[in-house]
Amino acid sequence: MALELTKRQHNIQVNEINEPSEMIHLAEHVQPDLILCPFLTKRIPEEVYSNVRIPCWIVHPGIEGDRGASSIDWALYDREDEWGVTVLQAAEEMDAGDIWSTKNFQIRRRNINTLTKSSLYVNEVTQAAVEAVLEAIENLSEGTSPRPLDYSNPRVRGTLRSNMTKVDRSINWEMPADEIACQIRMSDSSPGAHACFRTSQGTEDNKWTKAFRVFGAHLEKGKLRFLPGKPGEILGQRHGSLLVKCGRGAVWVSHLKRDKLKLPANMWLLTGAPTIKDVSNLPIRYGSHPNTFQDVWTSMTPDGVCFVHFDFYNGAMSTNQCKRLISVLRQVEENDFCKVMVLMGGNDVFSNGIHLNVIEAAEDPAQESWNNINAINDVVRCIFTSKKITISALRGNAGAGGVMMALASDFAFAREAAVLNPHYKKMKLYGSEYHTYFLPKRVGQDKANELLSNAEPILACEAAEVGLLDGCLGDDAEEFESWVNHQASFLARSPLQMHFVRKKNRKVRKEVMETVETCRANELSMMAQNFQDPEYHQARKNFVYH
C-alpha cells in the first residue's frame, strides 16, 4: 500500500507502533495530513482519533458493517463467496466509525488448498485495500463527507463478530477432512490451529502433541484418503508433511509449531514421538496438478511448454527442497518435447530464498546455511544452463534469493501486484544466487548497488521500468497466468524457438561460464564469513522467533 501511494506522489512515512505513546508522539511531532492504519492490531489512542485536524483512518479487512479482530478468519470459516475491505474513521467504538469507502471482492480459488488467511491478505485483500484507500483519499480531496454506519440499510451485511478463541481453532479429528482443512486455513499463517494426534491404539499422545499449532493443510483427494486408521492418527509422510486420518477422508499438514519455532511437520520426528516414529513414506511421481500434497509438480501443454510449480510454504527453500527441485528441472531438461520451461514458483510467493527456520533448527546452523545457499545456487545454475527457453513467472512476491533466481531465466515476468525485495542487507548477508552477475547485467552496476544497499521493496511495475523484469501484467493470478501462457506458446513456435536456443548456446559458452562461476565463488567467500558472524545468527533468530 505504501509503495502504491508513493508511486502516486504522496509523501509517505511508515512507522511500526508498539506503544500508544509512540503514536501520540508521532502525530504531534510529524503533523501529517492523514494517519492511515492498515489492518490494525492495537487500539488507537483517543488523543489521536479525536484530533479533528488530522483524519485517522482504519483499513478494516471486512465488508461494510463487519466489526472485530477476526474478520478474515470468520469469513473463511463461514465460507463466504464475497468479502471486502472498508476504510473508516477511527472512533471510540471499534470499527464503528464513519465510512470513507468500501471495496468488495469475490473469493474464488481454483485450488482450495491455497485459500489461507495469509494468502487472502496478500492477494485479494491487499488489492481491494489499495483501491479503497485511493478512493477514500479522492473523496477527502474533493470534500466528500464519509457516511455513518447504518445497520438498518439492507445492503449492510456485516455484523460485530467476537474474536476467535483457542476453542474455535482446536481441531476435532472426528470431523470431515474438508472442515478440518478449512479450520487450519483460516488460522494460517497466524496463529495456527491447535491439534492433538492419536496413536494407532486410539489414545491421545498429549505428551508430544500438546503444544503444537498446525499449518499448511492440503486435502487428500486420491486413494490415500481411504487408508485405514482412527481419526487423529498419522498415516504417512511425504516431503516434510504428515497425512492425518479424519472422521471422513484425510488431510495433510505441512508444518507444526512449538515454542515459537515453525518447522516442516516431519522434522518433529526427531523428538522420538511414539505416534509417528515408524510412519511410512508415501512417494509420488511428478506430473499434472496433484490431488494430494505435492509441493513440486509439472504440467505440459501440447505445444511443448512445461510449467514447473514449486509451491514451498512461505517461499522458503530448504536444502532438501532445492535438491528435489533440481531433480525435476533435470527431468524437464531431458524431455525433448519440451521447448519452453516456465518457472511458476508458488501461488503467493515465487521464492524467498534459503529456509531460515530449518537452518535455525539445525544442529550446526552455520553448516546448514552453507549447504542451503549452495543448493539454491545449484538451482540457479540449472536454470541458467538450460537448453530450453526459460521464463520465470512471479505470480506472488519474492525475497532476495527468489528475485535473483528469477533473473537467471531468459525472461522474467511478474504480476502487477507483486512486491520484490532484491536485497540481503536486513539478514546481515552479502548474498549469492549469482546476483553479482545477473543483477548488474539487467540493471547496470549503479542501479544494482542502489537496490542492494537501499534494502527497500519495489513494485513489479517499477522493477520492469528499471529493467529488473521484462514485463508485468495482470490484476489477478488468472489473468497473469493466461498472459504468460500466451507468451510461452509464442516462444515455443519452431522458428523463434530455434533462434533463442542458438542465442542461449552462445550465452553459456566456456568463457561466459568461467565468469559466472567466478561470481559464485566470490559471493560464497563473503557468505562463508557471514555464516560465522554473530550478527547473522542474531538476525536469523529475530526473524524466526518474531
Give the positions of each predicted feature:
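Internal alpha/beta domain cores that form substrate/cofactor-binding pockets in large enzymes
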Residues: 6-30, 34-62
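Donor/substrate-binding cores of folate-linked one-carbon enzymes
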Residues: 38-160
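C-terminal long alpha-helix characteristic of the crotonase
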Residues: 136, 430, 467-538
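An anion-binding loop in the catalytic cleft
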Residues: 168-294
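Conserved CoA-thioester-binding segment of acyl-CoA-metabolizing enzymes
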Residues: 261-344
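A structural preference for short, pocket-lining loop segments at secondary-structure junctions
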Residues: 303-308, 321-367, 378-391, 415-419
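Hydrophobic/aromatic residues within transmembrane alpha-helices
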Residues: 343, 355, 405-407, 463, ...
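Crotonase-fold acyl-CoA enzyme core
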Residues: 385-387, 391-400, 408-495
